[in-house]
Amino acid sequence: MTELLHLENYSFTYPQQRRPALSHVTLTVPEGAFMVLCGPSGCGKSTLLRQLKTVLAPHGLREGEITFCGTPLSQIPGRRQAAEIGFVQQSPENQVVTDKVWHELAFGLESLGFDTPTIRRRVAEMASFFGIQDWFYKNVTELSGGQKQLLSLASVMVMQPRVLILDEPTSQLDPIAASDFLQTLGRINRELGTTVLLTEHRLEEALPLATHAAVMDG
């Protein structure tokens, strides 16, 4: 497998903190992998994931290097990161930015300046893949928690990212919705070939989907 993301001897310390949140982390995420990042609460999993997209990275002291497709992440323009590095957060309320389902799906592509025919085609493809045609014209406020998180996922996938990063995406979902969401991630990896990097407390459901696992010991 080709190396997609790589951290080499990477450390991060929050401002006004002595102890680093991440200490000398080396990690390789191969292209096409489904990787589950494991470790106890507070070990730095969320902090690590946020280092992988510059716009989400917290302020602090960084040492070591992160590369994406062999290029230092710091040298990759924000537009390319927006398109190629997808990120789904714990709460869809923090990610949804428009009032209508269809507009939420189109918003990212509009922001990057894609033409209307391309936007319509990609939105239609993702609506079909995720089975959300029945609520395509609904207000986002009408959706259940599981539907909102699925919409957040579809809104990221419409960008056709090379890697999909998810930080505890089922933490606010009921068990059935959580199971369905994780199975959808498996489909994305298998059928679309998208690399997946995931932290998830439901390891008994996430690990059977994984091709790789990494453990942080804090």
Give the ranges of each region predicted by the language model.
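ABC ATPase NBD coupling module
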Residues: 71-86
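Conserved ABC ATPase "signature" region
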Residues: 117-135
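Conserved ABC transporter NBD signature motif
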Residues: 61-72
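Catalytic Walker B motif of ABC-type/P-loop ATPase nucleotide-binding domains
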Residues: 164-167
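Conserved ABC ATPase signature
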Residues: 139-143, 147
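Conserved catalytic motifs of ABC-family nucleotide-binding domains
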Residues: 160
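H-loop/switch region of ABC-family ATPase nucleotide-binding domains
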Residues: 200-201
